[in-house]
Amino acid sequence: MKLMDVHVLFSGGKDSSLSAVILKKLGYNPHLITINFGVIPSYKLAEETAKILGFKHKVITLDRKIVEKAADMIIEHKYPGPAIQYVHKTVLEILADEYSILADGTRRDDRVPKLSYSEIQSLEMRKNIQYITPLMGFGYKTLRHLASEFFILEEIKSGTKLSSDYEAEIRHILKERGESPEKYFPEHKQTRVVGLKKEI
């Protein structure tokens, strides 16, 4: 039986990594996609993690204007939530024109980025695609347990090491404008996969 290809938005973190593993175990063929906007090579970490996981990986470069607008929104709103949501929704809209099955690491407990039920319905109907969020049924404690079962993890403070999520390039643009990213992004921990504990 031919496996169905699914294109997974991938940052190299535990959530997008776990999503890819779950989809593989459900019988899909995960292709990992990391989005870059040409600001800095933030995709490097995701490339390393994709090799560890053994999945196909591709970097897609989108228009820098998307993250420039996100930086404008952060300065206007004084916090990053709406901007991160805008970038994520824009990315999904663009990718939905290219791929018939999309997935990401959105969790049940996430606030942003996260599509509402009606937004998911709209995306799937307008673009005639499937949008899968494998982690939506799991809470934080469960995901932490699952990730620790499969992965060797590295935890870093946000902004201290180049990551492959949207935040990295937005932070760089804010710095280019003479703004301090720490003024807008609350301090938080980011976790990335640096090895496997068991075969996937």
From Swiss-Prot:
InterPro entries the UniProt entry points to: DUF7411 (IPR055834), Rossmann-like_a/b/a_fold (IPR014729)
Protein known as: Uncharacterized protein MJ0690
Record organism: Methanocaldococcus jannaschii (strain ATCC 43067 / DSM 2661 / JAL-1 / JCM 10045 / NBRC 100440)
Biological classification of the source: Archaea, Methanobacteriati, Methanobacteriota, Methanomada group, Methanococci
